[in-house]
């Protein structure tokens, strides 16, 4: 080793282990030993001319071989067979398959498929897996040991050399913590840097993923070291962002010169799901897909206790790390004991959560464990030969399917035996099993992958059994193998579940069903949606009470893709995935058909009646008002959020029971609406009914009630050819104060004071109704915040039509048009009073169009009619 190289190694901390200083000097990072090729046609093999390196390149030196591949022992030069064995040194290869594609002296590896004559003459069967492979990564096909590869010298000869797996390793230096710093790359025995030219977040993300510091990287730049001793290896790195290793990215070898701004590439790593989720890593495993679970919290890494640790917890960990496939929990420090604090205990995930933070668990730092109980997981990727059971009531039974080339397919039952069933169930983590009738499960529509399978019973994997080639069969799907497995003590099965959430409900137990598939939340179409489907959704979410299905976008329309259609659950399945019979993304629906559920549904209904004394204490109360939704420019309301909203409907003899007007409940027996609602069909009580407690017009609900009309009172000054005095009262059928039953979803609104000026006393005003949303009439109750305007706006716009018995309201901004429309006539304009009670200040009356610029809505001013209302209703 030269003095300059020794100083450089000392600065970088890369000085080789000193077995003897003389041996270090004689055995430098680049070996110089050469041997002559043996005679004969078999070795060396000459490359075609177009594959040869240019002759101007000096022949690369061979390494000293500490232990060459067994298959090449007979083909090595005699001098090498009888020669000395040089000092052995670690080569930095982790378990698994490295991404290195150069020898430890810098010669680029040939693709394995580029030397077929040599491989065909090589007898070991273990080499067959490399025949035809287009990659050039170093491998050890003849057994455990140091990986190697073939390379071509300048004369076109094929030779081989060992690889140093540390080549391409990365580290971060100079940052404030382990998640940030200048990127350093290991190559040719020395750590070096990367020029920051074209360095972006995709490149940074690959670095973070390679270091297991999260999937999200932010590209940074740092000045080069002033010493100038650190080499620059690459520039213009061009990663896609999904590479496993920086070696797999396109890049330019540094040819000296000036790096732009003299800046080196640097990164800041973070977890891709955002700061709300704890950072997780897997430590001590044989690959990035397994290890002891460690969480980063309060500035340090710690472990998780394995109390109640199961595959559902592992499913969440794997999902949070972005690792799909088989999730399995490991106990009792299977991947070694940690050394930091024990962060969490008693983790009890359902398997649906996106982060361990969302699972029930102990408080941070609370536990009764030692590191002998450290929890671990393995997240085995989906690979050819993975099996599952589909179409059954759970993951323990169903049609046997095998994963091959990115697609699930079935197995033909020709020659099927109990031993085959035993091996399949054992691979799925069950102890026992039996063949089931194919008639119990729906036929598959995918490929038939396997036929004539024959197992001895000793196999640990299904693909170890003898069988035909993939896709070769003489069967139909009527011959698909179906089995039922019985649980064993170790559950190791493929989890087919995906996260489910409920959106836009009154509480977390109800809402529009959304599922997380292919990295995106989407909805379920309500074709065939029943209470049995709802039961499975609620069970998957951890609810044990009765479940009810809701259809026709009962909880509002979703915005993402429609993932699933024609769900067919029996009600006993473990998760929604067990009910899906149709390809993901295939449907014939719109978001107006989004499915919903209500979990722990008990249908409790209040039956209390109102009286004059209690009316003042319950009027204007909104018991459910924590969320807001469309009149023109509006949003879906919260179910039960406007309990005084009622609808005036035509009886079926005069139509289909359709909505005619909105209205406001003033007491158990009296309703306020607009006089013009009765212009077309007259004021005969036989023509009308009033519906209270409604939310979705097409879905019957537990608080919903339709009541007949006993009396219609139109203000005596109202004229059909005018819009003034547009107010009416409706008396419901029933005994005094016992017409509509009050509940959390059915309550009266308060009246304003006589001559009260709401522009001065009221704030936070809303209009509600089922009217025109700008696209169609809404099925769900809509709401929209609306400002009260000075009367001059309406006087200027409507001239003499606007009187002192009217209110002017609406948003005049071009991008915030809010207005009531057809179908909302007679509905309330509500404003919140001090003290959190709500009063009806306006009755939707008229206007020029819907949401038209500079044309605010006009509402009957209720405060001008309070004496008349009280004289009629006796309130």
UniProtKB/Swiss-Prot annotation:
Question: What's any one GO cellular component for it?
Answer: axon
Q: Which Gene3D superfamilies match?
A: Plasminogen Kringle 4 (2.40.20.10), SRCR-like domain (3.10.250.10), Trypsin-like serine proteases (2.40.10.10)
Instruction: Show the GO MF annotations.
Output: serine-type endopeptidase activity
Q: Which residues form the signal peptide?
A: 1-20
Task: State the superkingdom.
Answer: Eukaryota
| Region annotation Zymogen activation region: where it falls in the sequence | 619-630
- Residues in domain Peptidase S1? 631-874
> Do the record's keywords include Secreted?
yes
EC number(s) given by UniProt: 3.4.21.-
Q: Which keywords describe this protein according to UniProt?
A: Disulfide bond, Glycoprotein, Hydrolase, Kringle, Protease, Repeat, Secreted, Serine protease, Signal
Annotated region (Disordered) at 29-68
Q: Name one GO biological process term.
A: exocytosis
Q: Where is the protein localized?
A: Secreted
Catalytic residues (UniProt):
676 (charge relay system), 726 (charge relay system), 825 (charge relay system)
Site positions (Reactive bond homolog) are 630-631
Q: What is its main location?
A: secreted
The SRCR domain is annotated at 170-271, 280-381, 387-487, 500-601
Which residues does the UniProt record annotate as the domain Kringle?
93-165
Q: Which InterPro entries match?
A: Kringle, Kringle-like, Kringle_CS, Kringle_sf, Peptidase_S1_PA, Peptidase_S1_PA_chymotrypsin, Peptidase_S1A, SRCR
* Residues carrying a glycan: 26, 683
- Keyword presence, Acyltransferase: no
In UniProt terms, what function does this protein have?
Plays a role in neuronal plasticity and the proteolytic action may subserve structural reorganizations associated with learning and memory operations.
The Swiss-Prot or TrEMBL record describes its family as follows: Belongs to the peptidase S1 family.
Name of this protein: Neurotrypsin
Q: What is the lineage of its organism?
A: Eukaryota, Metazoa, Chordata, Craniata, Vertebrata
Q: Which gene encodes it?
A: PRSS12
């Amino acid at each position: 080793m030269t003095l300059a190289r020794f100083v450089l190694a000392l600065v970088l901390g890369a000085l080789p282990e000193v077995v003897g200083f003389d041996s270090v000097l004689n055995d430098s990072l680049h070996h110089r030993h050469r041997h002559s090729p043996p005679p004969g046609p078999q070795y060396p093999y000459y490359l075609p001319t177009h594959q040869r390196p240019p002759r101007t390149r000096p022949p690369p030196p061979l390494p000293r071989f500490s232990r060459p591949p067994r298959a090449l022992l007979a083909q090595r030069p005699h001098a090498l067979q009888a020669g000395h064995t040089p000092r052995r040194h670690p080569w930095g290869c982790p378990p698994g398959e490295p991404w290195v594609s150069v020898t430890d002296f810098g010669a680029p590896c040939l693709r394995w498929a580029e030397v077929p004559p040599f491989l065909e003459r090589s007898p070991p069967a273990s080499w067959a897996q490399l025949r035809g492979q287009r990659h050039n990564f170093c491998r050890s096909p003849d057994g455990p040991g140091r990986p190697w590869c073939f390379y071509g010298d300048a004369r076109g000869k094929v030779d081989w050399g060992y690889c140093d797996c540390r080549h391409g390793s990365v580290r971060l230096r100079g940052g404030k913590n382990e998640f940030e710093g200048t990127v350093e790359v290991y190559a040719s025995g020395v750590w070096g840097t990367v020029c920051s030219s074209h360095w972006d977040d995709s490149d940074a993300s690959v670095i973070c993923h390679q270091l297991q510091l999260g999937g999200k990287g932010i590209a940074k730049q740092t000045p080069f070291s002033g010493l100038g001793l650190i080499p620059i290896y690459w520039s213009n790195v061009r990663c896609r962002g999904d590479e496993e290793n920086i070696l797999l990215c396109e890049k330019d070898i540094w040819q000296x010169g000036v790096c732009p701004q003299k800046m080196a590439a640097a990164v800041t790593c973070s977890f891709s799901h955002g700061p709300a989720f704890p950072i997780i890593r897997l430590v001590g495993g044989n690959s990035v897909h397994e290890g002891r679970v460690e969480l980063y919290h309060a500035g340090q890494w710690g472990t998780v206790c394995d109390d109640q640790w199961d595959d559902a917890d592992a499913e969440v960990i794997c999902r949070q790390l972005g690792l799909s496939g088989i999730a399995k929990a490991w106990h009792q420090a299977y991947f070694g004991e940690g050394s930091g604090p024990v962060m969490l205990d008693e983790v009890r995930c359902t398997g649906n959560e996106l982060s361990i933070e969302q699972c029930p668990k102990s408080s941070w730092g609370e536990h009764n464990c030692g590191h002998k109980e450290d929890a671990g997981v393995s997240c085995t990727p989906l690979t050819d030969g993975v099996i599952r059971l589909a179409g059954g009531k759970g993951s323990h039974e169903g049609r046997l399917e095998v994963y091959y080339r990115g697609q699930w397919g079935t197995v033909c039952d020709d020659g099927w035996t109990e031993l085959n069933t035993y091996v399949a169930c054992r691979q799925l983590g069950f102890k026992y099993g039996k063949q089931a009738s194919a008639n119990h499960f729906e036929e598959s529509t995918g490929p038939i992958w396997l036929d004539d399978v024959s197992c001895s019973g000793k196999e640990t994997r299904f693909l170890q059994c003898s069988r035909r080639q993939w896709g070769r069969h003489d069967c139909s799907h009527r011959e698909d193998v179906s089995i039922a497995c019985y649980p064993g003590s170790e559950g190791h099965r493929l989890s087919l579940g995906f996260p489910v959430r409920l959106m836009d409900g009154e509480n977390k137990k109800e809402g529009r069903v959304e599922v997380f598939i292919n990295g995106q939340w989407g909805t379920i179409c309500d074709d065939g949606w029943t209470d049995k489907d709802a039961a499975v959704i609620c069970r998957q979410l951890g609810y044990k009470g009765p479940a009810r299905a809701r259809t026709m976008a009962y909880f509002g329309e979703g915005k993402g893709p429609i993932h699933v259609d024609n769900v067919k659950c029996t009600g006993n399945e473990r998760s929604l995935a067990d009910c899906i019979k149709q390809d993901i993304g295939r449907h014939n629906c719109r978001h107006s058909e989004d499915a919903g559920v209500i979990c722990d549904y008990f249908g409790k209904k209040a039956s209390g009646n109102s009286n004059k004394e209690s009316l003042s204490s319950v009027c204007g109360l909104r018991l459910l008002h924590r969320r807001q939704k469309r009149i023109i420019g509006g949003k879906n309301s919260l179910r039960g959020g406007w309990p005084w909203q009622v609808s005036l409907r035509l009886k079926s003899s005069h139509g289909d029971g359709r909505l005619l007007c909105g209205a406001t409940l003033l007491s158990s027996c009296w309703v306020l609406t607009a006089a013009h609602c009765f212009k077309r069909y007259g004021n005969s009580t036989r023509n009308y009914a009033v519906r209270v407690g409604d939310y979705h017009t097409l879905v019957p609900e537990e608080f919903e009630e339709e009541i007949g009309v006993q009396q219609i009172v139109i203000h005596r000054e109202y004229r059909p050819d005018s819009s003034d005095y547009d107010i009416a009262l409706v008396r419901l059928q029933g005994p005094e104060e016992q017409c509509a039953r009050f509940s959390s979803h059915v309550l009266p609104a308060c009246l304003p004071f006589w001559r009260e000026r709401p522009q001065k006393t009221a704030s936070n005003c809303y209009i509600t109704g089922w009217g025109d949303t700008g696209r169609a009439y809404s099925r769900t109750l809509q709401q929209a915040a609306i400002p009260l305007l000075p009367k001059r706006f309406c006087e200027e716009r409507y001239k003499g039509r606007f009187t002192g018995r009217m209110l002017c309201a609406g948003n005049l901004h071009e991008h915030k048009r809010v207005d009531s429309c057809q179908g909302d006539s007679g509905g309330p304009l509500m404003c919140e009073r001090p003290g959190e009670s709500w009063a009806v200040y306006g009755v939707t009356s008229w206007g020029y169009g819907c949401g038209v610029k500079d044309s605010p809505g006009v509402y009957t001013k209720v405060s001008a009619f309070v004496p008349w209302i009280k004289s009629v209703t006796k309130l």
